[in-house]
Amino acid sequence: MKHNLRIVALALLPLLLMSGTAMAAETPELELTLKEAVERALAVSFPVKKASLERDKALLEKQEASEKLRDFYVTFSPEVEEAHILAAQAEINYHIKSKLEEAEKRDFTTTVVEKYINVLIAQEKAAAAGKSLSLTQYQHDAAQISFSHGMISLSALQKAKNNLEEAEDVLSSAQQELNKAYTDFNILVGLGAESRPNLVSEIPYIPLDINNITAEINRALDTSPDLWAAERFISLKRLDLLRYFVPSYDVAELELELAELDARGMREEIKRKLLLLIDEILSVEKAVAAAEVQVKKAEEALKEAVKLQSAGLLTKGEVLQLEVALDSARAALDELQYRHAILMTAYRNLTGREILPPSLTEAADDGLD
């Protein structure tokens, strides 16, 4: 009986494999825009969920503190005064937690954008490495033919083999980096490590346009949810000094001083981070301009080479070499522009703007209003 079942299973195996292949072919490939990726990530983020729960907890504490005030008659007593202060502190704490939740969401969104773009960068590198390998393979095959006809030396053939092995290693490394980039991204958006979603958003390159750095610094300070929360924490600590039943007045004074120092330090850190970020963005923009020149030169060189090949003055291998050079130049430019987009995302976050531009396909909209 077992033998018969085995025969039946073996007979059905090709059909099962074909069915599985057909099902895989019919399974639609997951496509994700940047906006969709952010929405998925926020929905499964533990840090965001924790911040939300802390906000909810603070809301309950605020409501309970307000309820306790109803238990007191409208007369003055240390207990009544204490209850009013605790209610005020609970109110402040709720708003602090709300702002910290906002900060967590903004920071997490910035991270998702970075991981999304990192996948695009890794894809570019893997594609460029693949094209380079194709050229190296062509050169290796040509070297083998030349060697078999006694046209090149054994050392020249060995060099071609070494170049091929090196190109294979570069491609393997690029594929590993792509796998790592996908793994990092998939973790954020709640996908399995083996998933390879198609990231369909086009990331525009929009140079930074700043008219007044001081205004940008002030904007960053005025819109920072972390700084807002730190400054409200000072107010909360000041109320401790008014309490009748504060555990230690001296400790409360020190805690207030520490809160004030933290807020001042945060203000200076925001200024420092913004200035460094602006410098880095402008530096990348200079590199982008230089890379654009290299792409243009590579395009012109390839265009001229195609003409020479048509006239029989250049070989296919020489033209392929220029094609790979152009692909490499474009990949270098794309990577710089992607790096710039990551920095601009951090810039929008730091200055309180919408982290995602209203339209990712309209280069005219930079989100810096």
Feature locations, PLM:
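Acidic, low-complexity, intrinsically disordered peripheral segments
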Residues: A25-V38, Y73, S77, L100, ...
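Bacterial N-terminal signal peptides
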Residues: A11-S19
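Periplasmic alpha-helical coiled-coil/stalk elements that build and connect Gram-negative outer-membrane
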Residues: L60-K68, E79-L86, K99-E101, K105-R219, ...
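Short flexible linkers and secondary-structure junctions
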Residues: A24-N118, I234, R238
